[in-house]
Amino acid sequence: MNASFAPSSSFVAGLRHDWSRAEIKALFELPFSDLMFQAQSVHRAWFNPNEVQVSTLCSIKTGACPEDCAYCPQSARYDTGLEKEKLMAVEKVIEEARAAKASGATRFCMGAAWRSPKGKDMPYVTAMVKGVKSLGMETCMTLGMLSEAQAQDLADAGLDYYNHNLDTSPEYYGEIITTRTYQDRLETLDNVRKAGMKVCCGGIVGMGEEVLDRAGLLQQLANMAEHPESVPINMLVKVGGTPLEREADLDPIDFIRTIAVARILMPKSHVRLSAGREQMNEQTQALAFLAGANSIFYGEKLLTTPNPEANKDMQLFNKLGIKPEAYDVHETEEEQEAALVHQLEEAKLDAFFYNAAR
């Protein structure tokens, strides 16, 4: 949160954790201009509306995931043509982080396609955290489910953020995933909080869900005892070979409504415009920023789907008068990072990238 845009006491007092599904549905049903005005008003009370947080993401282990998430090309259950890669060497990860820092990065996110890390993996991932932290960078990981002990190990290594998405509403969840329960996800988030790390948690829209399911997802997030510091809102990226490859496109206005409602419900969180941004034109992205999105992944790729080229991002920022949010080493409540250009993976994976942070 930008110190020069500190919220008023009335907005602080207005933070809620008791939203009903009916209240959230009513927000979704507001006339579009009214919803956008309300979201932008909340956004301006907490953030500089002309700054967007910029993140980068490195896949440290790609493919061969045993889960059956219907949207994800990293699942071993689907023939998507994605080539699996084993865990990246610690030295290589640190080299990637060093290159990212040289390009202006202040925060480095690492993702692995696992159901959960095995005991033999933990020394390597904690070494990655320590190595990246030694460069003076902020760190984030997404490795699947975590036990209390694993979460504590990551926290002890210095990990700042852990990403674990809920994906959708509790009611629709079974249509998308059967190999991991909703409660499994909530327990991992509890373990992350208990260990003292910050939470990055959101979901995916456009998977065939109803408006009530989007309301249900946001209700789960907004009614947590502490709002996630980062809330990624992903638009489904349809990848050939996955069960959702022929899913109907979500209307962009419905996507913008989801961003706006997320901003209203979670005023102090960074709302991240994440996967699916490549399919969005400049006008849709501009509306998303107006609705309260203030974080993006920057660079050529996410984990398994293409991402808009970095120079295009900066061109759009220039058109809109947006600047990358500066990182303040004295502020630890919210993610803060500067713009960066960083090659994330080999070109052979270009057709198969998707933000598989789960």
Curated annotation (Swiss-Prot):
InterPro entries, per the entry:
Aldolase_TIM (IPR013785), BATS_dom (IPR010722), Biotin_synth/BioAB (IPR002684), Biotin_synthase (IPR024177), Elp3/MiaA/NifB-like_rSAM (IPR006638), rSAM (IPR007197)
Q: What superkingdom does the record give?
A: Bacteria
Could you tell me the keywords of this UniProt record?
A: 2Fe-2S, 4Fe-4S, Biotin biosynthesis, Iron, Iron-sulfur, Metal-binding, S-adenosyl-L-methionine, Transferase
One Pfam family name from the record? BATS
* Signal peptide span: none
Gene3D superfamilies reported in the protein's UniProt record: Aldolase class I
The protein's GO terms of the molecular function aspect are: 2 iron, 2 sulfur cluster binding; 4 iron, 4 sulfur cluster binding; biotin synthase activity; iron ion binding
Which residues are listed for [4Fe-4S] cluster binding in this entry? Answer: 65, 69, 72
Q: Which cofactor does it need?
A: [4Fe-4S] cluster; [2Fe-2S] cluster
* Pathway connected to this protein: Cofactor biosynthesis; biotin biosynthesis; biotin from 7,8-diaminononanoate: step 2/2
Report the EC number(s), separated by commas if there are several: 2.8.1.6
What residue ranges are annotated as transmembrane? Answer: none
Outline the extent of the Radical SAM core domain.
50-277
Record note on cofactor = Binds 1 [4Fe-4S] cluster. The cluster is coordinated with 3 cysteines and an exchangeable S-adenosyl-L-methionine. Binds 1 [2Fe-2S] cluster. The cluster is coordinated with 3 cysteines and 1 arginine.
Specify which residues bind [2Fe-2S] cluster according to the UniProt entry for this protein.
Answer: 109, 140, 200, 272
Family per similarity comment: Belongs to the radical SAM superfamily. Biotin synthase family.
Which HAMAP family does UniProt cross-reference here?
BioB
Mind telling me which NCBIfam families this protein's record contains? Answer: bioB
Q: What is the protein's quaternary organization? A: Homodimer.
The protein's role, per its UniProt record = Catalyzes the conversion of dethiobiotin (DTB) to biotin by the insertion of a sulfur atom into dethiobiotin via a radical-based mechanism.
User: Mind telling me what this protein is named?
Assistant: Biotin synthase
Its gene is bioB
